[in-house]
Regions:
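Short intrinsically disordered, low-complexity coil segments enriched in acidic
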Residues: 1-2, 74, 385, 521-524
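Serine-hydrolase catalytic core recognition
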Residues: 227-228, 290, 296, 442-525
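Beta-propeller folds
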Residues: 21-447, 452-453, 461-465, 470
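Bacterial N-terminal signal peptides
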Residues: 9-17
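Bacterial N-terminal signal peptides that target proteins for export
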Residues: 1-10
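Basic side chains
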Residues: 4-5, 220, 425, 512
Length: 525
């Protein structure tokens, strides 16, 4: 953060001193720093959206509008005033202040969901209420109340049960409102349902609902053996100490186990993974039939990983599906992605050839372990049939979803240029790739329920922001927004991109260079 501020200060100073263009403004820190009085005025216009099944909805300040993918026209679904009325607000009051963060939890139902504040029956302590409203019948469908100080919220879209953490203990509240404690001995030394391993290996949460929402896998982390590392919280009026558990290199690290809780029985079983000492458990995934759990297990040296399958009902280890090792490191970052049309196959992401790519695993074709050499002295061992789905000297950056009819997968990659991100689809049966955008700049996408449309958000050095709705079958897009350049009245420096060779004379190192306004190539800066 300090480096970014220094860079911004240098840039603003150069712009202020060297700006020579007639009639143009010079940037100030208020213009460029988040929190500045004019910062938001210099951000490009945006369009806030959410998917309602296969339909794209504009979630605006004052209401929600369905967007027609063929012509971009909008149809009002409901207004903010109407939503507040349905939530029980009076004429001169409001329960929610905007529609930016509403959700559409069921693609087949005219339901909108939001969170409102409330006071529960537990002594008047503040609560939050997840409320679902039918905007066709204009009535509440159901509500779910939970403590306002709850963290790590994880709601199952199938059962509508909610998992949450409070004071390091894990709880589950069912759709009917019954709350049960999964743990009771949580503390700073023993935490449940939270992220573990300091968020390494793609870990972003600590709970994992089964597809049907009837079972909950969760992390339990014993960090009592890890010493407190002193930190200072400078956000308080007077700085306070804020110790955290940090396993220093060569010192003892925390021990993680994985449990599976069933709300209908109130029982927990534990995966029989063995001694957790000096091991990492990550990328927890459920099988589509809710019966198996897959987990990637690494040693502390982080140079050997195993993909292991467990029986969810008993916790018994069933076997190893895949192994990967490398003399430097192995870094699994993603869980399994099962094909919606074939539950015996899943997509696995690996950097085993030096670049992150997609591999198709077929569980219906077990085999004697096949060992292969991989990138720079690494090796992998396949216990089922594995087919590379993508390959090359480029990186798969993000998987967006599936086109269910064409049986394709949509993803972002930097195949065109290392500094770009573009949207592709790849046909699973043969690996045929199709570019779905203009091949320029940086694109981010989100896909509707059946993969027929992708919302494409694009920017480049000459395009502030462009948002389109693209048909994934033919690649044709309908522009929804092209933002005007908010910097057009300012002295903007020239920004160039390029590459230089590393010390080995072979490796390309890519850069972005910001030149002073009125740059003189003959002048030494």
């Amino acid at each position: 953060a300090m480096t970014k501020r220094i860079n911004l200060f240098i840039m603003v100073s150069l712009l202020s001193v060297l700006a020579m263009a007639q009639g143009k403004k010079s940037f100030t820190l208020d213009d460029l720093l988040p929190g500045g009085s004019t910062y938001h005025q210099l951000q490009p216009q945006n369009l806030y959206t959410a998917w309602w099944g296969n339909r794209l909805v504009e979630t605006d300040l004052d209401g929600c509008n369905e967007i027609n993918p063929k012509n971009g026209s909008k149809k009002v679904l409901f207004t903010l005033q109407q939503l507040n009325q349905w939530l029980g607000a009076g004429e001169d009051s409001s329960v929610v202040r905007s529609c930016y963060n509403v959700e559409f939890p069921d693609g087949g139902q005219p339901w909108v969901a939001t969170v409102v504040s409330g006071k529960g029956k537990n002594g008047g302590k503040p609560t939050s209420i997840y409320t679902v409203v039918d905007f066709k019948s204009r009535k509440k469908v159901w509500e779910q109340e939970y403590p306002a100080d709850a963290t790590a919220l994880d709601r199952s879209p199938s059962s509508n049960s909610l998992a949450f953490v409070r004071q390091h203990n894990l709880y589950v509240t069912t759709k009917e409102g019954q709350t049960m404690a999964v743990s009771s001995d949580g503390s700073n030394d023993l935490v449940y349902g939270e992220t573990v391993h300091r968020n390494e290996f793609g870990i972003t949460k600590g709970t994992f609902w089964s597809p049907d929402g009837k079972q909950l896998a969760f992390y339990r982390m014993d960090q009592s053996m890890v010493p407190d590392y002193p930190q200072v919280d400078i956000t308080t009026r007077i700085a306070t100490t804020y110790p955290c558990k940090y396993p220093m290199a060569g010192e003892k690290m925390h021990k993680v186990t994985v449990g599976v809780f069933t709300p209908t029985t109130g029982q927990t079983v534990w995966l029989q993974a063995g001694d957790p000492t000096d091991r990492y458990f990550t990328n927890i995934s459920w099988s589509p039939d809710n019966r198996k759990i897959y987990m990637i297990e690494l040693n502390r040296d982080q140079n050997h990983a195993e993909l292991v399958r467990y029986d969810a009902a008993t916790g018994k280890k069933e076997g190893v599906i895949y192994e990967e090792e490398h003399p430097k490191y192995v870094e699994p970052m993603h869980g399994l992605l099962f094909l919606p049309w074939d539950s015996s196959k899943f997509i696995y992401q690996s950097q085993r050839d030096g670049y992150n790519h997609l591999y198709l695993f077929d569980l219906s074709k077990p085999q004697a372990p096949q060992r292969h050499k991989t990138f720079q002295g690494g090796a992998c061992e396949e216990h089922v049939e594995v087919t590379p789905l993508t390959s090359g000297e480029w990186v798969v950056k993000e998987v967006l979803g599936f086109d269910l009819k064409e049986k394709s997968l949509l993803f972002c990659s930097n195949e065109i240029h290392p500094l770009q991100s573009n949207i592709y689809k790849v046909r699973v049966k043969d690996g045929k790739r199709t570019l779905l955008d203009n091949g320029e700049g940086v694109h981010y996408g989100s896909v509707n329920a059946d993969g027929t449309y992708v919302e494409d958000r694009y920017s480049s050095p000459t395009v502030a922001r462009s948002i389109s709705l693209t048909d994934t079958r033919n690649g044709k897009g309908r522009n929804l927004l092209t933002a005007e350049d908010p910097w057009k009245d300012y002295n903007v420096p020239e920004i160039t991109c390029g590459s230089i060779k590393a010390a080995d004379g072979t490796t390309d190192l890519y850069y972005r260079m910001v030149k002073p306004v009125d740059f003189d190539p003959n002048k030494k800066y």
